[in-house]
């Protein structure tokens, strides 16, 4: 599975180029199933989840290839509408094949998804929305089986809870539905704005992306599109936190400051000097005093759950008491016991992590349990005394492109060990 061997005590300095956003690229890849033409994407990150998705598209009958950060897809010859357990089990995003397949082909069998073990992430929102649009859906034998005679029909949909994947799936399905669909209480994440812009680039008619009400005027078909995936705001935030807790100075290039308003505000509150340009962000912590901060995760534009683990590390080494409340996912403090093995002073009370006055972190062997937790353990290893080994790093490869190479360029002492 591989390990990272990290020598602690480094101060990160320099520039790092941010990759395309995994959480934008994945739904865009699935949305390419809606098109009868050629789709060319740029700024696609080189990640395990991306290659898994391309394999799934090929299994369905599409042409799909990646050359560096460019991806070409042609789904005109799709003949198979079943997403098998073999590919779906490692990646929850596979549920995003459901909407496009049933919208374009009237049929989809999607194995119930796997992926990060951080909570229920229910699929009932996807199912209920598609049923309101006319699909007949059964869940049996580990599959979601959806059928519709003719085209899906536009409908007025209300999301019982804010769901990024649910909003994305129904947006894609509605793009080829007959009539107008409105989605109320829609998720507002930037990655969904990217998805809507991509679908519109293929000829779709979606308005309201980035607000809580989407209006989708269905079209009969979608065609060619060339599109650049937006930068990864979570990778950006991760490197910024690493720079801050190491007492260094890090500049993230090819990123988008407007996507990180809540995170940048908390970094300033933590004592960092934050400077931004049109496509770059720099944090400077040299000769500055780190401070603990209180965090409460919530849907965009509030503080993102995907940055919670990284700020937990920040609070463990900052003076004072910092409280982190996780409101999005249950079971998303699996990094805490691993940080405690390194000496972190953290008390868990339900969905609240209370980080007390710091003791120095000491290197230890720790296990990555999910994507963002693994990033927090790498950050902790960079600032701990001595040597840290992070096991099960396949989690981090799902969402961070060549993270060790980027950290080494900033002065980190980190090595990948394959076993």
Curated annotation (Swiss-Prot):
Which residue positions does 2-(S-cysteinyl)pyruvic acid O-phosphothioketal occur at?
Answer: 116
Task: Indicate where this protein resides in the cell.
Answer: Cytoplasm
Residue positions binding UDP-N-acetyl-alpha-D-glucosamine: 92, 306, 328
Q: Would the keyword Transferase turn up in this protein's UniProt record?
A: yes
One Pfam entry name: EPSP_synthase
Which Gene3D superfamilies does this one have?
Answer: Enolpyruvate transferase domain
Keyword Cell wall biogenesis/degradation belongs to the record = yes
**Top-tier EC class:** transferase
An individual GO BP term: peptidoglycan biosynthetic process
Task: Provide the active-site residues from the annotation.
Answer: 116 (proton donor)
Listed under catalytic activity are: phosphoenolpyruvate + UDP-N-acetyl-alpha-D-glucosamine = UDP-N-acetyl-3-O-(1-carboxyvinyl)-alpha-D-glucosamine + phosphate
Q: Which pathway features in its UniProt record?
A: Cell wall biogenesis; peptidoglycan biosynthesis
- Enzyme Commission number: 2.5.1.7
- CDD domains recorded for this chain? UdpNAET (cd01555)
Give the record's family classification. Belongs to the EPSP synthase family. MurA subfamily.
Function as written in the Swiss-Prot or TrEMBL entry: Cell wall formation. Adds enolpyruvyl to UDP-N-acetylglucosamine.
Q: Which NCBIfam families match?
A: murA, PRK09369.1
**Name of this chain's protein:** UDP-N-acetylglucosamine 1-carboxyvinyltransferase
Q: Which organism is it from?
A: Psychromonas ingrahamii (strain DSM 17664 / CCUG 51855 / 37)
